[in-house]
């Protein structure tokens, strides 16, 4: 596996999502290191459809493992920069596909 540290910088509110990503060959895990809650944005596997989008508030001790094929946004810090331990698949093939959205998706919380 690939192991890295990802730093998420908070976006201004409301958050405008412009891109989603999917890992077709393996899962991807995010483990929070900064002790802060963060947003998780996901959509069902298959062709991306904004109607399937779901947003969750993850607690400061709660990691997330995105299943192979699950559309998701990068981990979203809320009020302060937050670091995450990221575990990703290693090996041949492109395991990260992005879709740029025709219309921005706005998350106001």
Give the positions of each predicted feature:
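Residue-level detector of short, conserved catalytic/binding motifs and their immediate flanks
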Residues: 28, 64, 82
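Ligand-binding loop in jelly-roll beta-barrel domains
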Residues: 69-85
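Conserved metal-binding segment of the jelly-roll/cupin
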Residues: 57-71
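Non-catalytic, conserved peripheral segments adjacent to functional cores
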Residues: 1-55, 79, 87-88, 92-100, ...
């Amino acid at each position: 596996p690939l192991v890295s540290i990802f730093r998420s910088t908070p976006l201004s509110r409301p958050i405008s999502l412009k891109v989603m990503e999917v890992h077709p060959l393996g899962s991807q895990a995010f483990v929070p290191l900064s002790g802060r809650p963060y947003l998780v944005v996901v959509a069902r596997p298959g062709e991306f459809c904004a109607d399937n989008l779901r947003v969750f508030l993850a607690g400061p001790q709660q990691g997330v493992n995105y299943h192979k094929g699950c559309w998701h946004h990068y981990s979203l810090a809320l009020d302060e920069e937050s670091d995450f331990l990221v575990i990703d698949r290693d090996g041949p093939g492109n395991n990260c596909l992005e879709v740029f959205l025709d219309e921005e998706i706005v998350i106001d919380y």
